[in-house]
């Protein structure tokens, strides 16, 4: 996949300790889709899904590989995630390679890239997917804890009969919970199947 370095959407090509390669590309270049289908040999439908901006969480097994699409946190400067800021992580894995594409940087991808660059991190594509999901779920858990803290604060205000003070927080928290459920709810089935697929 060395040819990718001459493609406008190229971001990095890293080698895992087990010998598999990881190609990471940006979807904001029209050449990315054609490169994925013509040079890497991905099925045209898979290549199209890997560059689509509007994706829903899903998993598709194709031949000897697996495509996983997930919604990830895109944290703001204050470390808080918002449903409207969530972006897609698009991952293709097969026996010898990982291909990912992005519209915006997300921490799980950046952290894995740093680990692999330093000779650490996952050794195989299956390990890569497991580590990526683990990092992703850690970020989700942190945001859920923040929401729980907000709910507890609202509960305290209501107990003290400070309804007027609680109302704005109630509306914001309800909106956030609904938004996260819309994006994260479909991932339950995807993550269950993906954990089985890489075993």
Where are these predicted regions, by residue range?
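Peripheral, non-transmembrane regulatory/ligand-interaction domains of membrane transport proteins
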Residues: 1-197
């Amino acid at each position: 996949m060395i040819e990718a370095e001459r493609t406008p959407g190229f971001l990095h090509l890293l080698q895992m300790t087990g010998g598999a390669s990881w190609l990471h590309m940006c979807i904001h270049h029209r050449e990315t889709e054609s490169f994925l289908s013509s040079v890497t040999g991905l099925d045209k439908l898979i290549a199209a899904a890997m560059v689509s901006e509007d994706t829903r969480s899903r998993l598709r097994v194709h031949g000897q590989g697996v495509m996983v699409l997930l919604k990830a946190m895109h944290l703001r400067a204050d470390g808080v995630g918002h449903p409207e800021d969530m972006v897609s992580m698009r991952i293709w894995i097969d026996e010898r390679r990982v291909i990912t594409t992005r519209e915006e940087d997300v921490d799980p991808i950046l952290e894995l890239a740093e680990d692999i660059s330093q000779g650490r991190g996952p050794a195989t594509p299956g390990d890569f997917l497991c580590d990526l999901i683990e990092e992703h779920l850690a970020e989700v858990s942190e945001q859920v804890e923040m929401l729980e803290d907000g709910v507890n604060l609202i509960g305290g205000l209501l107990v003290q009969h400070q309804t007027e003070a609680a109302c704005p927080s109630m509306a914001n928290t309800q909106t956030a919970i609904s938004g996260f459920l819309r994006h994260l709810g479909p991932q339950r089935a995807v993550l269950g199947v993906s954990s089985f697929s890489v075993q």
